[in-house]
UniProtKB/Swiss-Prot annotation:
One of its GO terms (biological process) is translation. One of the primary rRNA binding proteins, it binds directly near the 3'-end of the 23S rRNA, where it nucleates assembly of the 50S subunit. PROSITE patterns: RIBOSOMAL_L3 (PS00474). One of its GO terms (cellular component) is cytosolic large ribosomal subunit. Keywords: Ribonucleoprotein, Ribosomal protein, RNA-binding, rRNA-binding. This is Large ribosomal subunit protein uL3. The keyword Coiled coil does not apply. PANTHER family: 50S RIBOSOMAL PROTEIN L3, LARGE RIBOSOMAL SUBUNIT PROTEIN UL3C. Residues 128-167, 199-218 are annotated as: Disordered. Part of the 50S ribosomal subunit. Forms a cluster with proteins L14 and L19. One of its GO terms (molecular function) is structural constituent of ribosome. It comes from Prochlorococcus marinus (strain NATL2A). It comes from the Bacteria.
Length: 218
């Protein structure tokens, strides 16, 4: 399956493997999602499938979104996401996407927004070391110099400094699905995923299979 699925992070727990070792897992309520739009190379310039997730009350959705969803005959959905495909004609408008489309042992990439930490200093935000704490030093948690002198005469873009921490989109790659509960639309994934409980997650088949890695800025 080339499509992904949208879900909601429920929290973390643990499972025990065959050797009796505790394995940290994340519980995700994934889907059911509905296909809300099909795009083709002839009409849109590229082939893609758009899906929707999570019902929403009518008074909380605007008229353009309401009209867009009415074309596909779907209920009012809060979240919409698009996935590129080679041929969108293989999919049916209004069809459901559930956890049944995934398999136990499959590797997936999961994207979400990290927990916001507010304004943070350079030590907490970037893990820099502090200054000396004794011998008359007045530089304990100060950043120190952020540039040179006349050359270059400016601060380079991207300089790691204090600022807002978290709230960024992060993708954790190659996470293994340990268990699937079709009755409750649950995916049990090995390890942790971005975001706090209740946050939206985008789950896609892994682009490359290997050790789990994390991509995204602070």
């Amino acid at each position: 399956m080339s499509l992904g699925i949208l879900g909601k992070k429920l929290g973390m727990s643990q499972l025990f493997d065959d050797q009796g070792r505790a394995v940290p897992v994340t519980l995700i309520e994934a889907g059911p999602c509905r296909i809300t739009q099909l795009k083709s190379a002839d009409t849109d310039g590229y082939a893609a499938v758009q899906i929707g997730f999570q019902l929403i009350r009518e008074k909380l959705i605007n008229k353009p979104s309401k009209g867009h969803l009415a074309k596909s005959g779907n209920d009012l959905l809060r979240h919409l996401r698009e996935y590129r495909v080679e041929n969108s004609s293989e999919f049916e408008l209004g069809a459901s996407i559930t956890v049944d489309d995934f398999e136990k042992g499959q590797k997936v990439d999961i994207s979400g927004d990290t927990m916001g930490r507010g304004f943070a200093g350079y030590q907490k935000r970037h893990g820099f070391s502090r200054g000396p704490m004794s011998h008359g030093s007045k530089n304990h948690r100060l950043p120190g110099s952020i540039g040179a002198g006349t050359t270059p005469g400016r601060v380079y873009p991207g300089k790691r400094m204090a600022g807002r921490m978290g709230g960024k989109k992060v993708t954790t790659r190659a996470l293994e699905i340990l268990k699937i509960d079709t009755n409750h639309n649950l995916l049990v994934v090995k390890g942790s995923v971005p975001g706090k409980p209740g946050s939206l997650l985008n789950i896609r088949p892994a682009k490359r299979v290997g050790a789990p890695t994390q991509q995204g800025g602070k």
